[in-house]
Swiss-Prot record:
Record's catalysed reaction(s): an N-acyl-L-alpha-aminoacyl-tRNA + H2O = an N-acyl-L-amino acid + a tRNA + H(+)
CDD domains documented for this protein: PTH
Oligomeric and partner information: Monomer.
Protein name stated in the entry: Peptidyl-tRNA hydrolase
Residues the record marks as active site: H22
Major location (coarse): cytoplasm
Site (described: Stabilizes the basic form of H active site to accept a proton): D95
Keywords, in A-Z order: Cytoplasm, Hydrolase, RNA-binding, tRNA-binding
Cellular component terms (Gene Ontology): cytoplasm
Chain segments annotated as coiled-coil in the UniProt record: none
PANTHER family, per database record: PEPTIDYL-TRNA HYDROLASE
């Protein structure tokens, strides 16, 4: 039985950003949509694309904000408040500079680590950091001054192969989360290396 009621995939809107590292969370939502056969549709009151699906008998909501990354919290808080979903039942899928490609980690709580999407979500949830995060490794450019351009560029073919396998594993682990709970999903994903 899933403790999670809302899964959010972070990214930037528009074709210009679709294949960039910062959109890793949205890439994962797209895989979940294929796996569980749901379609996201734009809902302006939530500033995002949303879907509802019943998976393993559990109602689940999905959200991809259509705001830019640094305003992601507007969409998350609007949907969470409307459906009365507390932060502890939210899973945010996002790119992670501090993990190499081929690695993903699932955890609850923590800071924003400089991630502007997480920073805004925390602010819009009244500084509540207790939501879950699925961190998709994209690697680090090695110099903090290069981070902004790095996350807004496409991964190399080698990195993409690792990220692709990681997204497949993360999709499997989210299915485990829905059927068997967060602990089992966390243990499996956190042990994975592409």
């Amino acid at each position: 039985m899933s403790e999670i009621k809302l899964i959010v995939g972070l990214g930037n809107p528009g074709d210009k950003y679709a294949d960039t590292r910062h959109n890793a969370g949205e890439w994962l939502i797209e895989r979940l949509a294929r796996r569980f056969n749901f379609n996201l549709s734009v809902e302006s009151k939530f500033s995002g694309k949303t879907a509802r699906a019943v998976i393993s008998g559990q109602e689940m909501r999905f959200l991809v904000p259509t705001t830019f990354m640094n305003l992601s919290g507007k969409a998350v808080s609007a949907l969470a408040n409307f459906y009365r979903i507390p932060p502890e039942q939210i899973l945010v899928l996002h790119d992670e500079l501090d993990l190499p490609p081929g690695i993903a980690k699932l955890k609850q709580g923590g800071g924003h680590g400089g991630h502007n999407g997480l920073k805004d979500i925390i602010a819009q949830l009244a500084n509540n950091k207790n939501f879950y995060r699925l961190r998709i490794g994209i690697g680090h450019p090695g110099d903090k001054n290069l981070v902004a351009s790095y996350v807004l560029n496409k991964p190399s073919p080698t990195d993409w192969q690792l990220i692709d396998r990681t997204l497949d594993e993360a999709t499997d682990c989210i299915e485990i989360l829905m059927k068997e709970g967060i602990t089992k999903a966390t243990n499996r994903l956190n042990a994975f290396k592409a």
